[in-house]
Amino acid sequence: LRRGLLDQLSQGRIDLDRHERGAAFSLQQQQAFGLLSTGTLSDALDYTAEPAAVREAYGMTLFGQSCLAARRLIEAGGRFVTVFWDAYGLNAGSWDTHHNHYGRLKEFLLPVFDHAFSTLILDLEQRGLLDETLVLVLSEHGRTPQIDSKPAGAGRHHWSRAYSQVYAGGGLARGTVIGRTDRHAGDVEATPISPKDILATAFHLLGFDPDTTVPDPEGRPLPLTGTGRVRPELLG
């Protein structure tokens, strides 16, 4: 799998090197083109170049090493980096805990995430990168307040009425918990913040006007953030 990924990256780099229209790109496109068509990308993704102590600090898991690669990409000039949770290990290792919810959290999900994420934030801080890096830990929904007692046992299912997310760096407030649910964690009781609000706030922190519109396929103006608004509660 890793060799195949490396081969794909190498072939993509060769294809980009042959691209004759690179000079006509905008500044942003040229920056992206340059990152992909030089050794910078492959060097940044080579997390094995890090000292063993650093790799172990992130955790010797796919997610941990992916967070380390993300930090290296940021250092190399990457402007947008996504780290997906790896789905392997105990019960496929995903957060989609329709069964064995608590066992999966305790034995795999929480230890691996806490290990890698806390190290990433500390590493970014120590390298002077956290203030200029917006870190968002996002999911499309939460889990049901009720625990399923069917034969599969102890599962929690999809729930979008209330769920939490974690943010760090990039001009955000630190050490703050915003909002409150009822005692069952089923509904928001105070300070609801929508996904569109998060998008608007992120654009604001990145220097974009959240009210910007882009043309849809028919040429009509489409708001980037819909009805989202910048939330001052999130700002540092």
Task: Report the location of each language-model feature.
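Ligand-binding pockets and gating/stacking loops
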Residues: 1-236
